[in-house]
């Protein structure tokens, strides 16, 4: 019996399982945030924007967990932005929060693509956005990126 190989295999299998669980949890969280955002958006149309504050208080009380107005507003904005797609589920919530202020879909798609291709951290993505990397691309390059989609 080769104990080393069994130990190594056990550790590798555990790492694979953790990665799968992390991805699944992230995707589940994002789907939940999207669905909550959709409901908040619809509720806002019926009851006004003050409903977010009311729901924040109720959720915090009922679930014994703080659901701030800001967090719920981000969820609503996340839904309304339309940037959540199954493939993009590979990004974390903190990545999405960096993308929410952007309004141009081509710009958003550019930053999503570079984040996925380069495995950028939230901080690295933020730096690229702040440096206006997309805006510094020439029009010809931007056109190619759009056509490539």
How should each PLM-predicted stretch be described?
Residues 1-149:
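Basic, low-complexity intrinsically disordered segments
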């Amino acid at each position: 019996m080769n104990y080393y190989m069994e130990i190594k295999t056990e550790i590798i299998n555990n790492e694979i399982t953790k990665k799968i669980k992390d991805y699944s949890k992230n995707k589940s969280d994002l789907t939940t945030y999207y669905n909550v955002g959709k409901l908040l958006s619809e509720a806002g149309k019926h009851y006004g924007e003050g409903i977010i504050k009311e729901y924040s208080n109720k959720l915090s009380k009922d679930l014994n967990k703080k659901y701030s107005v800001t967090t719920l507003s981000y969820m609503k904005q996340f839904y309304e932005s339309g940037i959540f797609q199954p493939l993009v589920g590979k990004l974390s919530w903190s990545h999405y929060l960096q993308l929410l202020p952007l309004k141009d879909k081509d710009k958003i798609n550019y930053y999503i693509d570079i984040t996925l291709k380069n495995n950028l951290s939230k901080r690295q993505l933020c730096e690229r956005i702040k440096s206006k990397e997309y805006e510094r691309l020439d029009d010809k390059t931007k056109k190619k990126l759009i056509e490539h989609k």
